[in-house]
């Protein structure tokens, strides 16, 4: 993944790895909440450009950014969401640190099968951004989106892993696509999850 340098307030995107191929839309920094903009990379790069996955619909949209605008990093922490078993598995390298039951999207707004990174971290006690109690006290925003919704609450329909104040629904299909965890489980995951943590949602 790549983290935008703090002195770059707006990350310019390019359609191809050429200076003249500027796209109209870029990405603000910080974003999407607090914290430096963090984007998923594809592994493709040139001397001056790096290809990224842009956090827009449709999922998998790519663009190029200038190498000088970002720093590359990697994480050995991985969250696997198993939709069939409705559980989240936290890995550090090859070691399983915790397995946790989760609630997932309902039949109308299913949780999509995608790979993503954590591109936003939100903690109720530390943030000026208000989210309803339904989100619990902690949220890991993801770089991919619901494939059933065009927007959600006036924003892009980004997926997230978050806590909940309705733990009785853990293990069910009830959400708009997000993954819900018990407060205890998401607090444990938060000890290891950082911006750039990989998330793999499996069928």
Labelled PLM ranges:
Residues 1, 53-81, 92, 104:
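Boundary regions of SH3-family modules and the immediately adjacent low-complexity/disordered segments
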Residues 69-77, 106-113, 125-203:
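Exported/periplasmic cell-wall-interacting domains
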Residues 7-10, 45-49, 60, 74-76, ...:
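Extracytoplasmic
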Residues 88:
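Gly/Thr-rich phosphate-binding beta-strand-loop-beta motif of the actin/hexokinase/Hsp70
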Residues 1-41:
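Beta-loop motif signature
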